[in-house]
Amino acid sequence: MLVRALAVCGVALISASLAVAADNWVGTWKLNAAKSKYSPGPAPKSLTLKFEPSPDGLKLSQELVDAEGKASQGGFVTKLDGKDVAYAGNPDADTASPKRVDDNTYQNTWKKAGKVTITTKVVVSADGKTLTVNQTGTNSKGETVNNTAVYDKQ
């Protein structure tokens, strides 16, 4: 009986620690264009990321207004386990494979038709106020991408 109670407590603690770790990303983040670098440019007019818990892990929703003023939306749901998940609304990818590195960092590989296009590293600052996304690879136009996007928590 004691072993069973300890096992139940262990599962509860693991579940709670996963939820707390995911909380580092949870919230709404707005692009700070002044602190960001887009190569190739230009930077989007606006980009908002929203991370929220979901029954299947962590849900990312994004709203973009590109440099020409065209609006789009997209996102994915992941367990941050490195497995491919559908990525809607991204011209550079149809799947993503986000994987947790630590409580403040995850890496992501974007693929289009099974071919790697862009790799990303997403880091929440120690104070939880800034999210930095570094991207390298090749976009859907065949251009080399080397972006650093900085977001402020709302």
Q: Could you describe each region identified by the protein language model?
A:
Residues M1-A5:
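Positively charged n-region of N-terminal signal peptides that target proteins for export
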